Structures are given as C-alpha cells and as structure tokens.
Regions:
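N-terminal phosphate-binding or glycine-rich loops at protein starts, especially the Walker A/P-loop
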Residues: 1-53
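Short, ordered loop/turn segments at secondary-structure junctions
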Residues: 11-13, 42-47, 80-81, 113-114, ...
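Glycine-rich oxoanion-binding loops at beta->alpha junctions
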Residues: 52-106, 115-116, 143, 168
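Short glycine/serine/threonine-rich phosphate/pyrophosphate-binding segments
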Residues: 15-25, 49-50, 91-94, 114-122, ...
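C-terminal non-catalytic interaction/assembly regions of soluble proteins
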Residues: 256-419
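Gly-rich Lys/Arg/Thr-decorated short loops/hinges at beta-loop-alpha junctions or inter-strand turns
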Residues: 2-9, 68-82, 141-151, 182, ...
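Accessory alpha-helical/coil subdomains and C-terminal extensions
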Residues: 99, 107-112, 120-130, 137, ...
Length: 419
C-alpha cells in the first residue's frame, strides 16, 4: 500500500495495559514515517470513526506516548458498540469509507476483545464489499483471556496478578479474625463465560503458603450442597476459607446466579452481584459469619500492581500490528505463542481474524480440579508465568504519575452522522 494515514481505537472494557498496546502502535508507526503518515485515534472507539471524532496523536510528545506504557485504562476512550452486518446497516460501512477517504486512512488498528475482532474483521472486508482498500489489524486485549489461538490475552496477566495478590492478602486478614469473627471471605471477579480470572485466585495458595481457596467457575455448574460441604471442610480444617467466584457462575437451571435480566450493548447478560448471593447461601447453610467484596473496575485498572510479562506482551502486540500492516497483511491479529514454561519463553505469531472473531476460549477441563473447586498443577503451570515480574509506574507525591494526553481533535471535513 502507498503512503497512508492510520486509524487506531480502543474497544470494550479497558485494562491496566491497553495503553501499552497503544504505545506500541504509535511508537512503531512513528518509526515508519515513510509508510505511515498521521495516526488518528478514534475518540471512544469505533464511534469516533463513525462520528468523525478523531484525535491527532501527532500532537503528543514522544515522552507522553512513552508514558502510556505505564498508564492504565483507555487514553482515547473506549466503547461497547458492535457494527452490524453490511446487510443490516450498510450506511455505517459507507460512512466509514467516507471518513477513511476524507482523512486518507489506509490502515485500521482496533484494540479489543472478541466482539472487537468481529468489528475489525468486517472493516477488513471493505475492499471486497465496497471497493475501498484498507488493511485492518486487530490488536488483542481482554481481561477475560478468552480469545482463541493466542496463548494468553494482554490485560489478563495483570488482572490475574491482582486477584492472586488480593486473595492472598484478604485470606491473611480473615485468618487473623477467624477465631472470634469472620470465617469466610467471598471475592467476586469478572468472567462472563470463562473462568480464567477466577482461576487466578488459586495462585494465592502455594506449597510455602497454604491457603484454603474455593473457586466457583462458570464452566462448572453450581451445586449448592457440594459447595457448602467444601466450605465447611475448609473452615473445620483451617478455621477460615476464601471463596473466589466468577460473575458468570450458573445454577442447575442454566441461569446466572447473578442474572437480573439486563443486557449490555453487545447483547450479553449484564452481570454482577453474585458475591452477596453466595454469601447468603453460606449464611443460611452453615451459619458462618462472612464478608464479601467485588473486585469490579479495581481488578482491571490496577496498573500499580501490573504483571511485567503482561506489559511487555501488550506492547509487543501493538508493535507487531503495525509491522504486519506495513508488510501488507490484512484481516489478521498478532498472537502470543508460548515456547516453553521453564524457563518461560514466548514469541509473536499471527492468526487470521476469521478464526478469531466470535470464538470464545473456555478453561480446559484439565485445568479444573476433580472436585470442581480448584486449579490443577497444569493450570498453575500455565498461569504462573503470566503474573511474574513487577513493572511499577513512576510515583509523585505518593501516587502513581499517570499521563493524560492532550487529545487534540482533528478538524472535521464531513457532515454530522447520527448513530
């Protein structure tokens, strides 16, 4: 492709390291100024492209772009907006082409999870469907760790580290209080269908620091009697117990324990609130005193405790996306390929978006213990390297010194567009 500008945007739930991927994209694009001109970021994801709300990243200093590597969440704003098919909403695709033509955009980098991969796939097909040449590369990101093909997903390692550390620390706390007060602590974590984040709670216990952790996975149907028996055994043996429960746990009726009938913009069940449900089950069934907490945004925003492995992989995915684009690739996603566990080694691979979009990677059965409440040695071997290493941000006056970009708007050239 001839010299063209590029579009970059962030989509879906943000993470502690998605900005590291942005830094990888922007710094690498600047290193290839003979092939890529300006990089325009979409304000609030693909919505920024549709509404021509573009950000001129060239207005940012090299130092500001570099600081994205240690700044959490989405520097350009994100969105939960999924493009419908060309047949269902042709006007949106025609609008994208208008925007791309008006701003001479030939490269499209979309940083997100499974639904974002679907959006990127649709954009990558514009050359065939509407005759506009574009190279669309998906930059992987999801704390849920449920994208296929790639060994792991940027964003997950840092959430896993946060959950493992929080579970260990909270367990120390409840152990201190268990003689005369709290016996059980319940931590609710993200994970609609895949239990990867919940599994990370199992890392809190190790041979040199044994902790009674009971995990409730979305992949394992919740059995109240078995669960209560497990908690009861743990409390009788250790005096206390910690429970890590995924928001996506389902009962025997197939419904989410926490389903309130709400849906998000992607049509997924809007979950949350399973921790108090589980807490009441423990109270009613065992009569134990409990405390519960919800990790919620804290787990995905905690850049101060990010995994160094995760930060490095996130940056590498952004860098590879640009390199793949200028090499002529389209409709692909850079992936993380695990080469060995001990020592942990990985490299960058490539996957076709047609094999990624709308596919969820569940926890394999061999990663879940026979009783359904813990992780296996194989799971521990998989997870452990992903939380290794510290990559602390700089601090100022006792707080992390995160960057806020100027986010200078690009002048609009087209008429207003209603979503």
């Amino acid at each position: 492709m001839a010299f063209k500008n590029a579009f970059y945007a962030q989509s879906g739930g943000v993470t502690a390291v998605i900005n590291a991927s942005a830094a990888g994209v922007l710094e690498t694009a600047r290193q290839h100024s003979d092939k890529i001109g300006n990089v325009y970021a979409g304000r609030n994801g693909i919505i920024g492209a549709l509404t021509e709300d573009l950000i001129d990243t060239n207005a940012e200093s090299a130092a500001a772009i570099a600081a994205l590597r240690h700044t959490p969440s989405g520097a350009f704003g994100s969105c939960r907006y999924k493009l419908k098919s060309l047949e269902q909403n042709r006007r949106e695709y025609e609008r994208l082409i208008e925007i791309f033509k008006a701003h001479d955009i030939g490269y499209f980098f979309y940083n997100g999870g499974g639904d974002s991969a679907d959006t990127c796939l649709k954009v990558s097909q514009l050359a065939d469907t509407l005759g506009y040449p574009i190279q669309a590369i998906h930059v992987p990101k999801t704390v849920d760790n449920d994208l296929p093909i790639t060994d792991c997903c940027p964003g997950f390692g840092s959430v896993a580290k946060y959950i493992a550390v929080s579970t260990r620390e909270a367990s120390f706390d409840v152990a201190s209080m268990s003689k005369t007060s709290t016996k059980v602590f319940i931590l609710e974590v993200m994970g609609r269908h895949a239990g990867w984040i919940a599994a990370a709670g199992g890392l809190a216990s190790s041979p040199d620091c044994e902790i009674p952790v009971v995990i409730l996975f979305p992949e394992v149907t919740f059995d109240k009697e078995k669960f209560l028996a497990k908690v009861d055994r743990c409390v009788k043996e250790f005096g206390y117990c910690s429970v890590v429960v995924s928001e996506g746990v389902k009962g025997n009726d197939g419904n989410f324990l926490s389903d309130q009938g709400l849906r998000d913009a992607f049509g997924h069940a809007q979950l949350g609130g399973v921790a108090p449900v589980v807490a009441n089950i423990i109270k009613d069934g065992l009569g134990l005193k409990y405390h519960w907490g919800v990790a919620d945004y804290l787990q995905r925003a905690a850049r101060h405790i990010a995994s160094k492995t995760d930060v490095e992989q996130a940056y590498a995915m952004g860098k590879a996306a640009v390199e793949y684009a200028i090499a002529g690739h389209n409709s692909v996603m850079p992936t993380i390929v695990r080469q060995s566990n001990a020592p942990y080694k990985w490299t960058v691979g490539m996957a076709q978006l047609s094999n990624v979009a709308n596919v969820e990677k569940m926890m394999p059965a061999e990663f879940i213990s026979d009783d359904g409440f813990g992780i296996t040695p194989a799971c521990r071997e998989y997870l452990s390297p992903l939380i290794e290493g510290e990559d602390y941000p700089p601090y100022k006056n006792g707080l992390p010194d995160y960057v806020r970009l100027k986010n200078v708007a690009v002048a609009k050239k087209l008429s207003e567009f209603k979503l």
